[in-house]
């Protein structure tokens, strides 16, 4: 409540990992129903927008995978539609969290089906999370914009840098894929984030996408504010931060820029917190992380405020040469066994 009185809003994340059984999925479904009902009954506090709920699709179906596409687009769709309809009735926004790259196309297909559902027409409060470390991030944003224009829909869109980087790298190596689905340099991800932010604040998305920029990097936040001023879209977007992080940074943003800021807050039992906490530590505790470098006395301030494009230009290639491509993982001893990602439509079409 004190944070909301200061101007913050919230997005509540019900803790829990991917459902392995139908019982798991039903438990998470009940948790989401309760969360929506609880938030919906709370009176509005402070000047910020009403709190929202973040939904993890893999928690709502034990077979959330491309091989089970038909089941996903019927059974999982029905679950999410029920939650979204319930949320609409109680004026609680819904945001669908991003997960691994393998599930991206399937999640977009399901999201499109939700936007086309008669029960959700004209709502404008069912959002999506997109990851800037993905090489497909900008094309996804363009596709979503065209979809929104076709349907006359407005969608909240949370832009994050991504929390599954280690998983994506290791999976691509284990499967012997041709390349990685994510940028292998942090500077590449930071540059992608700013390129996507520029697009989201441009006239192309106006009236279609409501941008939500999630970051704890002070340079990124400053760049977004500058891009918004340049695009003449002041305050027609919001920032987001994790609970317990970025307090001083975003207190300043609210005070000096009167900008909406939403706190992403985990909710659940202690036993469910560990996987979430590990992802946050991997994301923000890496040596290259802004948050990590900020408290390192050996890192000069100049390097913290250096533009990521400037940093990226110092390298000979966009790819990190210290992370060999999956086929060359065991070079020079031998070539890695080759695999094919059947969850990506482009790979399937090439067969």
Model-identified regions with their sequence ranges:
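Positively charged, amphipathic and often flexible ligand-engagement surfaces
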Residues: 1-338
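Alpha-helical bundle segments enriched in helix-capping/polar residues
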Residues: 337, 341-345
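Short, intrinsically disordered, charge-balanced linker/junction segments flanking boundaries
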Residues: 345-351
């Amino acid at each position: 409540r004190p944070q909301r009185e200061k101007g913050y809003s919230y997005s509540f994340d019900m803790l829990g990992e991917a459902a392995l059984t139908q019982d798991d999925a039903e438990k998470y479904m009940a948790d989401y129903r309760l969360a929506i009902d609880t938030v919906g009954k709370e009176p509005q506090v402070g000047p910020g927008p009403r709190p929202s709920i973040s939904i993890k699709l893999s928690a709502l179906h034990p077979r959330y995978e491309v091989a089970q596409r038909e089941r996903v687009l019927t059974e999982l769709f029905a679950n999410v539609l029920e939650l979204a309809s319930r949320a609409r009735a109680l004026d609680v926004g819904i945001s669908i969290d991003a997960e691994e790259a393998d599930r991206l196309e399937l999640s977009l297909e399901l999201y499109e089906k939700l936007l086309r559902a008669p029960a959700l027409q004209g709502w404008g409060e069912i959002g999506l999370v997109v990851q800037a470390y993905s090489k497909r991030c900008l094309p996804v944003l363009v596709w979503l914009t065209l979809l929104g224009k076709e349907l006359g829909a407005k969608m909240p869109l949370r832009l994050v840098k991504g929390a599954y980087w280690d998983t994506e790298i290791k999976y691509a190596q284990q499967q012997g894929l041709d390349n990685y689905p994510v940028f292998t340099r942090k500077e590449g991800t930071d540059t992608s984030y700013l390129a996507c932010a520029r697009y989201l604040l441009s006239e192309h998305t106006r009236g279609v996408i409501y941008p939500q920029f999630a970051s704890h990097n002070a340079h990124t936040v400053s760049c977004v504010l500058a891009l918004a001023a340049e695009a003449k879209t002041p305050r027609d977007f919001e920032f987001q931060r994790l609970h317990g992080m970025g307090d001083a940074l975003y207190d300043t943003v609210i005070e000096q820029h009167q900008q909406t800021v939403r706190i992403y807050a985990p909710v659940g039992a202690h036993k469910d917190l560990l996987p979430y906490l590990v992802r946050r530590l991997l994301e923000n505790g890496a040596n290259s992380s802004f948050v990590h470098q900020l408290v390192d006395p050996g890192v000069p301030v100049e390097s913290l405020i250096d533009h990521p494009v400037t940093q990226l230009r110092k390298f000979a290639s966009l790819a990190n040469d210290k992370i060999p491509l999956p086929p060359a993982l065991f070079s020079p001893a031998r070539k890695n066994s080759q695999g094919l990602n059947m969850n990506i439509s482009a790979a399937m079409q090439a067969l």
